[in-house]
Design a protein with these regions (language model features):
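Long, compositionally biased stretches
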Residues: 1-49, 69-148, 153
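Extended catalytic/binding region for NAD+/ADP-ribose chemistry, centered on the ART fold
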Residues: 51-56
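Short active-site loop/helix that positions an aromatic residue
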Residues: 58-68
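Long, low-complexity, intrinsically disordered segments
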Residues: 151-162
Protein backbone atom coordinates (compact mmCIF):
# COMPACT_ATOMS: atom_id res chain seq x y z
CA UNK A 1 0.00 0.00 0.00
CA UNK A 2 1.30 3.44 -0.90
CA UNK A 3 0.59 6.40 1.36
CA UNK A 4 1.95 9.32 -0.73
CA UNK A 5 1.83 11.76 2.21
CA UNK A 6 2.93 9.16 4.77
CA UNK A 7 1.30 9.14 8.19
CA UNK A 8 1.15 11.93 10.75
CA UNK A 9 4.56 11.91 12.40
CA UNK A 10 5.99 9.61 9.72
CA UNK A 11 5.80 11.59 6.46
CA UNK A 12 8.92 9.93 5.05
CA UNK A 13 7.47 6.40 5.30
CA UNK A 14 5.30 5.84 2.25
CA UNK A 15 5.32 2.10 1.47
CA UNK A 16 3.41 -0.34 3.68
CA UNK A 17 1.98 -3.81 3.69
CA UNK A 18 -1.30 -4.66 5.41
CA UNK A 19 -1.18 -7.95 7.32
CA UNK A 20 -3.80 -9.92 9.23
CA UNK A 21 -3.00 -10.40 12.91
CA UNK A 22 -4.80 -13.75 12.95
CA UNK A 23 -7.67 -15.01 10.84
CA UNK A 24 -10.29 -14.35 13.54
CA UNK A 25 -8.71 -11.21 14.98
CA UNK A 26 -10.23 -7.74 14.55
CA UNK A 27 -6.70 -6.31 14.24
CA UNK A 28 -4.52 -5.70 11.19
CA UNK A 29 -0.86 -4.70 11.03
CA UNK A 30 0.26 -1.80 8.87
CA UNK A 31 3.94 -2.67 8.48
CA UNK A 32 6.30 -0.10 6.99
CA UNK A 33 8.38 -1.40 4.10
CA UNK A 34 10.61 1.69 4.32
CA UNK A 35 11.56 0.99 7.96
CA UNK A 36 10.99 -2.55 9.21
CA UNK A 37 11.06 -1.36 12.83
CA UNK A 38 7.83 0.59 12.33
CA UNK A 39 4.39 -1.01 12.37
CA UNK A 40 0.96 0.14 13.46
CA UNK A 41 -1.99 -1.85 14.74
CA UNK A 42 -5.25 -1.04 12.95
CA UNK A 43 -8.88 -1.89 13.55
CA UNK A 44 -12.14 -1.23 11.73
CA UNK A 45 -13.73 1.42 13.97
CA UNK A 46 -17.25 0.21 13.18
CA UNK A 47 -16.51 -2.95 15.18
CA UNK A 48 -16.57 -1.01 18.45
CA UNK A 49 -18.25 2.27 17.43
CA UNK A 50 -21.02 1.49 14.92
CA UNK A 51 -22.05 5.16 14.70
CA UNK A 52 -18.55 6.32 13.66
CA UNK A 53 -18.90 8.66 10.71
CA UNK A 54 -16.10 9.73 8.41
CA UNK A 55 -16.87 12.54 6.01
CA UNK A 56 -14.51 12.23 3.06
CA UNK A 57 -14.14 15.23 0.78
CA UNK A 58 -14.37 15.08 -2.99
CA UNK A 59 -10.67 15.99 -3.10
CA UNK A 60 -9.75 13.01 -0.92
CA UNK A 61 -11.92 10.69 -3.01
CA UNK A 62 -10.22 12.05 -6.11
CA UNK A 63 -6.72 11.77 -4.57
CA UNK A 64 -7.32 8.10 -3.81
CA UNK A 65 -9.13 7.52 -7.12
CA UNK A 66 -12.05 5.85 -5.35
CA UNK A 67 -14.65 4.94 -7.96
CA UNK A 68 -17.03 2.86 -5.83
CA UNK A 69 -17.82 2.94 -2.12
CA UNK A 70 -16.93 -0.75 -1.75
CA UNK A 71 -13.36 0.00 -2.88
CA UNK A 72 -12.77 2.16 0.21
CA UNK A 73 -11.86 0.79 3.63
CA UNK A 74 -11.55 2.88 6.77
CA UNK A 75 -9.27 1.88 9.64
CA UNK A 76 -7.94 3.60 12.74
CA UNK A 77 -4.62 3.25 14.52
CA UNK A 78 -4.80 1.86 18.03
CA UNK A 79 -2.43 1.86 20.98
CA UNK A 80 -2.12 -1.37 22.93
CA UNK A 81 -0.79 -0.72 26.45
CA UNK A 82 -0.06 -3.59 28.83
CA UNK A 83 -3.59 -3.34 30.26
CA UNK A 84 -6.14 -3.95 27.45
CA UNK A 85 -8.72 -1.88 29.36
CA UNK A 86 -6.65 1.17 28.43
CA UNK A 87 -6.51 0.38 24.69
CA UNK A 88 -7.32 3.46 22.64
CA UNK A 89 -8.11 4.28 19.03
CA UNK A 90 -7.30 7.42 17.09
CA UNK A 91 -10.76 8.32 15.81
CA UNK A 92 -9.62 11.87 14.97
CA UNK A 93 -7.28 10.77 12.16
CA UNK A 94 -8.57 7.66 10.35
CA UNK A 95 -6.85 5.99 7.43
CA UNK A 96 -8.70 5.51 4.17
CA UNK A 97 -7.50 2.83 1.79
CA UNK A 98 -8.49 2.22 -1.81
CA UNK A 99 -8.15 -1.56 -1.99
CA UNK A 100 -8.40 -1.53 -5.77
CA UNK A 101 -5.31 0.59 -6.47
CA UNK A 102 -3.63 0.13 -3.07
CA UNK A 103 -3.34 3.79 -2.21
CA UNK A 104 -4.13 5.23 1.19
CA UNK A 105 -4.32 8.46 3.09
CA UNK A 106 -4.65 9.56 6.69
CA UNK A 107 -7.14 12.38 7.14
CA UNK A 108 -7.96 14.60 10.10
CA UNK A 109 -11.64 14.94 10.98
CA UNK A 110 -13.13 18.23 12.16
CA UNK A 111 -15.65 16.44 14.40
CA UNK A 112 -14.88 17.44 18.01
CA UNK A 113 -16.61 14.28 19.29
CA UNK A 114 -13.63 12.23 18.09
CA UNK A 115 -10.31 12.15 19.90
CA UNK A 116 -6.88 10.68 19.29
CA UNK A 117 -7.27 8.44 22.37
CA UNK A 118 -10.79 7.02 22.30
CA UNK A 119 -11.08 4.16 24.82
CA UNK A 120 -12.12 1.01 22.95
CA UNK A 121 -13.25 -1.03 25.97
CA UNK A 122 -15.48 1.77 27.25
CA UNK A 123 -17.08 1.92 23.82
CA UNK A 124 -17.57 -1.87 23.84
CA UNK A 125 -19.27 -1.63 27.25
CA UNK A 126 -21.64 1.05 25.90
CA UNK A 127 -22.41 -1.15 22.93
CA UNK A 128 -23.10 -4.09 25.26
CA UNK A 129 -25.63 -2.03 27.17
CA UNK A 130 -27.32 -0.82 23.98
CA UNK A 131 -27.31 -4.08 22.05
CA UNK A 132 -26.99 -7.71 23.02
CA UNK A 133 -24.27 -8.66 25.46
CA UNK A 134 -23.25 -11.67 23.35
CA UNK A 135 -21.85 -9.53 20.51
CA UNK A 136 -19.95 -7.29 22.89
CA UNK A 137 -18.58 -10.22 24.90
CA UNK A 138 -17.33 -11.84 21.69
CA UNK A 139 -15.59 -8.61 20.70
CA UNK A 140 -14.06 -8.21 24.18
CA UNK A 141 -12.78 -11.79 24.02
CA UNK A 142 -11.24 -11.19 20.56
CA UNK A 143 -9.65 -7.93 21.69
CA UNK A 144 -8.19 -9.53 24.82
CA UNK A 145 -6.89 -12.55 22.89
CA UNK A 146 -5.30 -10.39 20.21
CA UNK A 147 -3.81 -8.17 22.91
CA UNK A 148 -2.26 -11.14 24.71
CA UNK A 149 -0.79 -12.35 21.41
CA UNK A 150 0.80 -8.95 20.77
CA UNK A 151 3.71 -7.13 22.26
CA UNK A 152 4.48 -3.42 22.20
CA UNK A 153 7.99 -2.09 22.78
CA UNK A 154 8.41 0.19 25.80
CA UNK A 155 8.99 3.24 23.62
CA UNK A 156 5.88 2.44 21.58
CA UNK A 157 7.80 2.72 18.32
CA UNK A 158 7.86 -0.95 17.43
CA UNK A 159 5.05 -3.46 17.48
CA UNK A 160 5.69 -7.12 16.84
CA UNK A 161 3.53 -10.23 16.83
CA UNK A 162 4.57 -13.34 18.71
Amino acid sequence: ITLPAGLIGFPELKQYILLDHESDSPFKWLQSLDDGAIAFVLINPLLFKPDYLVEVSETEISDLKIEAEEDAVISVIITMPSNPKNMTANLKAPLIFNLKNRFGKQIILNNSAYTTRHNIMEEVKKRAEEAGKDDAQQLVAKVKKAHSDSQVAQDGSKVTAK
